[in-house]
């Protein structure tokens, strides 16, 4: 793991002791989650902008932003302590490419258009698509980090679902929604 990702992990574990941001209690539990956040970089198309919904403890947005400093990330996180954590990360790590918005997806009224929309452990895929597609460029993609329950949430083709260990990555273009 690169040093910046190690710094992120260390800070998250420190904050986690008092703020309960993640279920991970140590680096050996957190490291696979960071690897999981970065895995889609192996198969997704290049992107210049990303909206992360329900950023929480920063997964997947912070590892992605650290690995892709040229990409603009907008992190939507409505909970105060989690937004404070994300703002702290921005102040101590080289994360000039992120903007933290303390709002729920349903309350976010910006006209922004992004290349990629990500989310991990927030809501059903169909809900996320319905509420967020207006922020996605016509040639953009959704990337949702899901578990085996994905097939119960939404119909998807094998070409839209990528598996790694127990994770299912749902990767679907906006164009294919029609």
Swiss-Prot record:
Subcellular location: Cytoplasm
Enzyme Commission identifier(s): 2.1.1.170
InterPro entries for this protein: rRNA_ssu_MeTfrase_G, SAM-dependent_MTases_sf
GO MF terms, alphabetically ordered: rRNA (guanine-N7-)-methyltransferase activity
Organism domain of life: Bacteria
Residues that bind S-adenosyl-L-methionine: 54, 59, 105-106, 120
Catalyzed chemical reaction(s): guanosine(527) in 16S rRNA + S-adenosyl-L-methionine = N(7)-methylguanosine(527) in 16S rRNA + S-adenosyl-L-homocysteine
GO cellular component: cytosol
Top EC class, one word: transferase
Annotated signal sequence range: none
Keywords: Cytoplasm, Methyltransferase, rRNA processing, S-adenosyl-L-methionine, Transferase
Function: Specifically methylates the N7 position of guanine in position 527 of 16S rRNA.
Similarity section: Belongs to the methyltransferase superfamily. RNA methyltransferase RsmG family.
Protein name: Ribosomal RNA small subunit methyltransferase G
Species per Swiss-Prot/TrEMBL record: Helicobacter pylori (strain ATCC 700392 / 26695)
Gene field: rsmG
């Amino acid at each position: 793991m690169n040093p910046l990702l190690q710094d992120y992990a260390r800070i998250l574990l420190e904050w986690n002791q008092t703020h309960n941001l993640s279920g991970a209690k140590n680096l050996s539990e957190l490291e696979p989650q960071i690897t999981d956040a970065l895995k889609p970089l192996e198969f997704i198309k290049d992107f210049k902008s990303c909206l992360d919904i329900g950023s929480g403890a920063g997964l997947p947005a912070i590892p992605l932003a650290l690995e892709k400093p040229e990409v603009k990330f907008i992190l939507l996180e409505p909970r105060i302590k989690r937004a404070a954590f994300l703002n702290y990360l921005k102040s101590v790590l080289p994360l000039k490419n992120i903007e933290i918005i303390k709002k729920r997806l349903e309350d976010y009224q910006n006209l922004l258009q992004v290349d990629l929309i990500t989310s991990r452990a927030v809501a059903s895929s169909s809900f996320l698509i319905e509420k967020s597609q207006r922020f996605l460029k016509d040639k953009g993609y959704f990337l949702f980090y899901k578990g085996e329950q994905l097939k119960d949430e939404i119909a998807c083709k094998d070409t839209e679902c990528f598996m790694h260990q127990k994770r299912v990555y749902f990767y679907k273009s906006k164009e294919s929604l029609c």
